[in-house]
Amino acid sequence: MTIRTNTLKTRRRDLAQALINRGVNLEPIGKWTNVGLQVFESSVPIGATPEYLSGHYMLQAASSFLPVIALSPQPHERVLDMASAPGGKTTHIAALLQNTGIIFANDANKARTKSLTANVHRLGCKNVVVCSYDGREFPKVMGGFDRVLLDAPCSGTGVISKDSSVKVNKVMLLVWSSFCLC
């Protein structure tokens, strides 16, 4: 399991030490990120620590850091996250923007915006507007953006990591890969 440090509230080394003190066996993820921690085992529920509840980190796959790193948002920019729930990438963008600028966190599925809103608040993101539009409507609804993130859940990689039967079923793997818009 991996977690992403919320730099709006803490530093990775401080978070790591706090979790180690609670009985969590972890280490920083490689040189390509300064916010990721790999959790190997824990004597406490990682999604219920005081640090988690106060928004010091997000449970998030390390691969989900990459779209935001590639986007490279800069402070004071106007950013659209097209498929934002549950908010891992949106809150990562907010941290990189240092809570400046504005992020339009969109999810076409209105029901999913509940978890998105909860995470935005928990992590202390003050520059996020949560919305639920069909992406084709944005040109009609609001002006341009400095950056747009569309990490569409199309490749099935999340499903593959959670369902081992997909790994051995070539037909299912081909079905999932055919959905990729990349």
Regions found by a protein language model. Give the residues of each.
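S-adenosylmethionine
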Residues: M1-C182
